[in-house]
Swiss-Prot record:
NCBIfam families: L18_bact. Residues 1-26 are annotated as: Disordered. This is Large ribosomal subunit protein uL18. One of its GO terms (molecular function) is 5S rRNA binding.
């Protein structure tokens, strides 16, 4: 069977998730990137509960963004998810890049979240 980019991403994500798990003390910051948007969630895997979330589809962000598929938009999502997590008392997270390479939009989101106060 021919290996496609999507199947390679899914394989990488399965490999990553074997070792990554979020707890209530240190939840998982999960990132999903599509061609048009980027989504970030802070997840407690033990309780199976989403604690904070942000995306380029948020009404707060969508108005101020000229394009949702840029590194600048990803950085804004990173700042917003970090602010929402810190408001709920979450400072430490485990970063889950979702099988994507740590480059470009995923990297921009992670660095913006770090600058906003999340530790990972």
């Amino acid at each position: 069977m021919k290996s496609t980019r999507k199947s390679a991403t899914q394989r990488r994500h399965r490999r990553l998730r074997r070792h990554l798990s979020g707890t209530s003390e240190r939840p998982r910051l999960a990132v999903f990137r599509s061609n048009d948007h980027i989504y970030a969630q802070v997840i407690d895997d033990v309780a199976q509960h989403t604690l904070a979330a942000a995306s380029t589809l948020d009404p707060d962000l969508k108005k101020s963004l000229s394009s949702t598929a840029t590194q600048e938009a990803s950085a804004e999502v990173g700042k917003l998810v970090a602010q929402r997590a810190i408001a709920k008392g979450i400072n430490q997270v485990v970063f889950d890049r979702g099988g994507k390479l740590y480059h470009g939009r995923v990297k921009a989101l992670a660095e913006a979240a770090r600058e906003a106060g999340l530790n990972f």
